[in-house]
Structure formats: C-alpha cells, structure tokens
A protein has these predicted regions:
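Conserved, structured core segments of small domains
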Residues: 1-107
Length: 107
C-alpha cells in the first residue's frame, strides 16, 4: 500500500501546474495498470472525522498540510524492495511529496 503525503498544493498551484501534474499521475497509473500491479487507489479529501469510544466523533485529525494523507494505492509487488522501486516514480516527489510504503496483512 502506498500512502501519499504532501506534493503539489492545489491552493497555490497554477491551473497549468495542476493539469501537468494530473497528466503525470494518470500516466503513472496507466503504466501500473498495464504492468498488472495496480489494484486500487483514490485521492482523499483533506479533512474527516475521528470516532472515539462511546460513539463520539470529532473533527480531524488536524495536521500540517505536508502530513495530510492525500491518497492511497493498493499495488501488487514481490517484496518491499520492489514496492519501493515502484513508489520511486511518484510524480509528487517533484513537489516535496512523500510515499509511505506499507505491507498489507491479508487474513
């Protein structure tokens, strides 16, 4: 699983930068699909709710923009090294973004 943080800020990016970045993302996704390693992925809205014991929901979590999880991918990789190599092509690195790479435990 890839968790994406940071990257191009839509609040400050020009329309041209946004369009160019989206084309790079779509090209990357298309490449992963052609290789048969892309399973799923979505962008996430910047805010949500946190549910606590007793059914209490609070706004948040709140974090600095660079810490917000902006989206995720589920991919198929042989091992962590292969997953890191795949993540290395993420378009958001050009804008200071990061990719957290995690194994998913299958039950």
């Amino acid at each position: 699983m890839f968790l994406f943080r940071g990257g191009l800020d839509p609040q400050t990016a020009s329309p041209e930068e946004m369009q160019n970045n989206m084309q790079k993302w779509m090209g990357w996704v298309d490449d992963l699909k052609k290789k048969g390693i892309y399973t799923a992925g979505e962008a996430l809205l910047p805010s949500g709710k946190t549910l606590h014991k007793g059914g209490i929901a609070t706004d948040g979590p709140f974090a600095e923009t660079k810490e917000v999880i902006g989206g995720f991918f589920i991919i198929q990789a042989q091992d962590m090294e292969a997953a890191l190599s795949i993540a290395g092509d993420c378009p958001d690195f050009a804008f200071g973004g990061t990719v957290e790479v995690r194994d998913v435990m299958v039950f």
